[in-house]
Each structure stands twice: as structure tokens, then as C-alpha cells.
């Protein structure tokens, strides 16, 4: 149980090796934890608003965060200093490094008369001059705003999930949409996470389902149904398992008891689409989930402001579906 945030968690992420766990929340200060024993290593102090998203690069050297103070910041992971702060015209909802770590993408909200836009920046030699530089690519979103984002294979495409349930793939060289999923989801997409090999990804949606999609064709492969909005979903790196987390909207939380089981982490079989386990823990909806890269534990961040790291026992690995 990691206690270091004063307000609800918005996103959590492991680095590639899994020794560090990053968390951000609405309290303006992203944290980094040592995942093995839950020791807090430090905070990244500099944002003036709720931090909505974060990502760490392949080498665990840079961290990118996006916040409601209308900035995207790039940090030095080890020293906690701001390398660059990029101003935007509305709050930043998603941010991700590419696999190579040479580029980063972020998207802004449709708010205050501004349309939602997707930006691409070159972060190879990132320094304070990045705030004055023009982004390498800028794509306005005419229809629905972006609520989650992933990099596609080989850093050639970006996959975006939208507020109306659409998923699209953008070719970053041409700067245009190449694939559109249509209406597999009937409500907004809260989260998208890739499988370990990048061939597929799982979505979490307000329409009470999580779905598995092919990363290139956006073909819907599997669907995992629940009774309430899904806020986050993650794919196990070693087993055919998916974990979903959710609950109702934050404003309805006080009207239900925790016994109703609405705030559990729910485990589904990736292929058979069957739920086989639930884990309790949070006193409110789960906002973000992440599997440890070795697949032996997972972390969840909730509306209650806690991050919980849960390690699986041996029976979890023996639970083979017949």
C-alpha cells in the first residue's frame, strides 16, 4: 500500500525493468516508488494543476507528464528536475514516449474554445529551448476529443481512443488517419494498454466493457463484459490474463457500500473471456492499473488516493483453464 498522494490517482506506470513505479494524481505532484518494497524515492515538483498522465522512456531517464495547468513537462527521472516545459492552450490529457525514446506525443483537451489536438515533439536533445520550438507534427481532432493514446509498432503510427468510443490509427509521416475502428465501443474510452509484444491492445470503456483489438487492423478480437464503467485494463505479460478496474463515476461513490464489490480488480481470461478472480482493496473506483513487467504482481491506483501493489501467490500461476 503506497500512500503519498493527497488526492485521487490518475495514472500509474512501471518502467521497463519494473524496479520503479510512477504515479500521478490530482494533487499536482507525480511520485516515483521503488516497486519492491514500496519506498518513495521522490516527487516531481513543478506542476500547478492536476496531473492527468505520465510516461517513462525505455531507459528510465526521462519522464513526461501532462497536467491541467496547460503544460507538458519533461523531467530527469534521477534528479527530479524539469528538462523542458511546453505550454499548451488547454489541459493535457495524454502523453507518451515512443519506443525509441526519440519522440513524444501528447494531446490537449477540447476546452476553453480550443479544439483537441495531437502534438508530436522531438525529445532527443530535449532542453529548455523545447518550449519555444514548434511541434514536429500537429493534428487537430475535428470530431471527438482524445482520452487515451498509444504508440503503434516501429514508431510509425499513433493509436488514439476517443470520447465517443472511436479508435483511430494515425500515420505520423503523412499526418493523417489510416484506420478507424467504427463503433465497437458505444461510450468513451478511458484507457488503452498494449500487450507485451505490441500486437494487440486492451481498451477500457465507459460502456462497461473492455475489448481486445489488433494493433494494426483495429479488429475487435475479444470482449470482457462487466456491469459498470471500466476505468482501466491491462494485459498480463506472461499469462493469458486481463485485469479490469473501475467502478461508477466519482460523484456517485458515496451512495454505495464497498461490500457491493464495485471497486474490485477483476481478472478475466484473455481468450475465453471468463472472469475467474476478484481482488478487493480500494475504497473507491480504480482509475489505473498496471502489470509488473515480470507478470508476478500488479499495481492499482484508486480514487481514494492510494496505490496498491499486490503480489500473486503460487496458486495464481497454477490456475490453468481446462
From Swiss-Prot:
This protein's UniProt keywords: Cytoplasm, Initiation factor, Protein biosynthesis, Repeat, WD repeat
Assembly mode: Component of the eukaryotic translation initiation factor 3 (eIF-3) complex. The eIF-3 complex interacts with pix.
Main location: cytoplasm
Subcellular location: Cytoplasm
Coiled-coil parts of chain: none
Transmembrane segment boundaries: none
Protein family (similarity comment): Belongs to the eIF-3 subunit I family.
S-S pairs: none
The organism of origin for this protein: Drosophila yakuba
InterPro entries per UniProt: eIF3i, WD40/YVTN_repeat-like_dom_sf, WD40_repeat_CS, WD40_repeat_dom_sf, WD40_rpt
Record's function text: Component of the eukaryotic translation initiation factor 3 (eIF-3) complex, which is involved in protein synthesis of a specialized repertoire of mRNAs and, together with other initiation factors, stimulates binding of mRNA and methionyl-tRNAi to the 40S ribosome. The eIF-3 complex specifically targets and initiates translation of a subset of mRNAs involved in cell proliferation.
Gene3D superfamilies, per database record: YVTN repeat-like/Quinoprotein amine dehydrogenase
HAMAP family reported in the protein's UniProt record: eIF3i
Pfam families: EIF3I
MF-aspect GO terms: RNA binding; translation initiation factor activity
Protein name in the entry: Eukaryotic translation initiation factor 3 subunit I
One term under GO cellular component: eukaryotic translation initiation factor 3 complex, eIF3m
Amino acid at each position: 500500500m503506497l500512500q503519498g498522494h493527497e488526492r485521487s490517482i490518475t495514472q500509474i506506470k512501471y518502467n521497463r525493468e519494473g524496479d520503479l513505479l510512477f504515479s500521478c494524481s490530482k494533487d499536482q505532484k507525480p511520485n516515483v516508488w521503488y516497486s519492491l518494497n514500496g519506498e518513495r524515492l521522490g516527487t516531481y515538483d513543478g506542476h500547478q494543476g492536476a496531473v492527468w498522465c505520465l510516461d517513462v522512456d525505455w531507459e528510465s531517464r526521462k519522464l513526461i507528464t501532462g497536467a491541467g495547468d496547460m503544460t507538458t513537462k519533461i523531467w530527469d527521472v534521477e534528479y527530479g528536475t524539469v528538462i523542458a516545459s511546453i505550454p499548451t492552450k488547454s489541459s493535457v490529457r495524454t502523453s507518451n514516449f515512443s519506443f525509441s525514446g526519440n519522440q513524444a506525443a501528447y494531446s490537449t483537451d477540447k476546452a476553453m474554445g480550443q479544439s483537441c489536438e495531437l502534438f508530436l515533439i522531438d525529445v532527443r536533445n530535449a532542453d529548455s529551448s523545447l518550449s519555444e520550438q514548434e511541434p514536429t507534427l500537429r493534428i487537430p481532432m475535428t470530431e471527438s476529443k482524445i482520452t487515451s493514446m498509444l504508440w503503434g509498432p516501429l514508431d510509425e503510427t499513433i493509436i488514439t481512443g476517443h470520447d465517443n468510443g472511436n479508435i483511430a490509427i494515425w500515420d505520423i509521416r503523412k499526418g493523417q488517419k489510416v484506420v478507424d475502428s467504427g463503433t465497437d465501443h458505444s461510450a468513451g474510452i478511458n484507457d488503452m494498454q498494449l500487450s507485451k509484444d505490441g500486437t494487440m491492445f486492451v481498451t477500457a470503456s465507459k460502456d462497461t466493457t473492455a475489448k481486445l483489438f489488433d494493433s494494426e487492423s483495429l479488429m475487435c478480437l475479444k470482449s470482457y463484459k462487466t456491469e459498470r464503467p471500466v476505468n482501466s485494463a491491462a494485459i498480463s505479460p506472461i499469462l493469458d490474463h486481463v485485469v479490469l478496474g473501475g467502478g461508477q463515476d466519482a460523484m456517485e461513490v458515496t451512495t454505495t457500500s464497498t461490500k457491493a464489490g464495485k471497486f474490485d480488480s477483476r481478472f478475466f481470461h484473455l481468450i475465453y473471456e471468463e472472469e475467474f478472480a476478484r481482488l478487493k482493496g480500494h475504497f473507491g473506483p480504480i482509475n489505473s492499473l498496471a502489470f509488473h513487467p515480470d507478470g508476478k504482481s500488479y499495481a492499482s491506483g484508486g480514487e481514494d488516493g492510494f496505490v496498491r501493489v499486490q503480489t500473486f501467490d503460487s496458486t495464481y500461476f497454477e490456475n490453468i483453464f481446462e
